[in-house]
Regions:
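Internal alpha-helical scaffold of NAD(P)-dependent oxidoreductase catalytic cores
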Residues: 105-114, 121-122, 126-212, 236-239
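Electropositive phosphate-/nucleotide-binding environments in soluble metabolic enzymes
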Residues: 29, 68-75, 98, 141, ...
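Alpha-helix C-terminal capping/helix-to-coil transition sites in glycosyltransferase folds
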Residues: 51-52, 131
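NAD(P)+-binding Rossmann beta1-loop-alpha1 motif at the extreme N-terminus of oxidoreductases
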Residues: 1-51, 270-279
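NAD(P)-dependent Rossmann-like dehydrogenase/reductase catalytic/cofactor-binding core
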Residues: 2, 52, 145, 193-284
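Rossmann-like NAD(P)(H) cofactor-binding subdomain of soluble oxidoreductases
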Residues: 52-55, 63-124
Length: 284
């Protein structure tokens, strides 16, 4: 069984490292020679030229640019892979806009596709690495069986959902949920500051309840995933005022802390995942 991991950046690098430990015939692919050389230094086959494979794991970055979800890299990888092997299983681990996988299956006449969004946290890779519970949705029963066999062989536990779309949405919704939690904390922190109330003491107090886990409010919601994913979800469902409000809250919070009102350090520390012990995230 030949496996090719397409995209060797933040998503693909840990994936290709893990896959290569299980499948001897594993190759990493990236258009960046620097990324390819980094993988080669780890003793893993990698190239800027795509090879034929039985399974392609697509792990390239997706973007939200100029007000639109940009899935062009996903489509390019899919097109290249199916050109080399029309019967290959395509496993999308990248974050996708709802409907992306099905549209590509129809456009390129593929009957073997699955969506299994990655979950990985760089800050605690030993605990929250590649091997953790994943959501998987497939195009059909045959694709589901092939994908389950693949991930079971990798030792990755799977929660199966009924469709590609549910799997796509699950990634967007979980990251948006985390965005909302941080935005609420940011808004509350500003309110506390205006009313001379200790936000940290209040947060510590409310987090003593078993079903409350209030996020930290630090230096704004940054990183590669959270700001992008909430925008992609809004593209799908634009009539969600709560999401628009959260983005506005974070923008307002950033503007306020730019003048250092909380006595924080002048350098900005962006938040993608919160590493507070009371507020664990499973990464992107």
């Amino acid at each position: 069984m030949n496996v090719c991991v397409m995209g060797l950046g933040n998503i693909g690098l840990p994936v290709v490292q893990h896959v290569s430990k299980v499948y001897r015939q594993t190759q990493g692919y990236d258009i960046s020679l620097e990324a390819v050389n980094a993988v080669k230094k780890k003793g893993i086959d990698a190239s800027t030229e795509l090879a034929c494979a039985d399974i392609y794991v697509i792990a390239v970055n997706t973007w939200h640019r100029n007000g639109y979800s940009d899935m062009s890299a996903i489509e390019d990888c899919t097109k290249q892979a199916l050109k080399l092997n029309p019967d290959a299983l395509i496993c999308f681990e990248s974050t996708l806009a709802k409907g992306t996988a099905r549209k590509l299956a129809e456009k390129y006449n593929s009957s073997n596709m699955a969506v299994c969004p990655h979950r990985w946290w760089k800050q605690e890779e030993d605990k929250y690495g590649v091997i953790q519970l994943r959501v998987l949705g497939a195009l059909n029963q045959e694709s589901q069986k092939k994908a389950l066999d693949f991930y079971n062989t990798l030792g990755i536990p799977i929660h199966v959902v009924s469709s590609l779309e549910i799997a796509e949405l699950s990634k967007l919704v979980e990251n948006t949920y985390y965005y909302l939690r941080i935005a609420y904390a940011e808004d509350l922190k500003l309110l506390c500051e205006d009313n001379r109330v200790s936000f940290e003491e209040l947060r510590e107090a409310v987090n003593t309840k078993w079903n409350v886990d209030m996020a930290e409010a630090r230096d704004g919601i940054g990183g590669e995933c959270l700001p992008k994913d909430i925008q992609i979800l809004i593209d799908t469902y634009p009539n969600m005022p709560l999401l628009h409000g959260a983005i506005s809250t974070d923008k307002n919070y950033r503007a306020k802390i730019a003048h250092n009102p909380f006595g924080s350090k002048p350098e900005t520390q962006q938040i993608e995942e919160n590493n507070n012990s009371n507020n664990k995230s499973h990464g992107t």
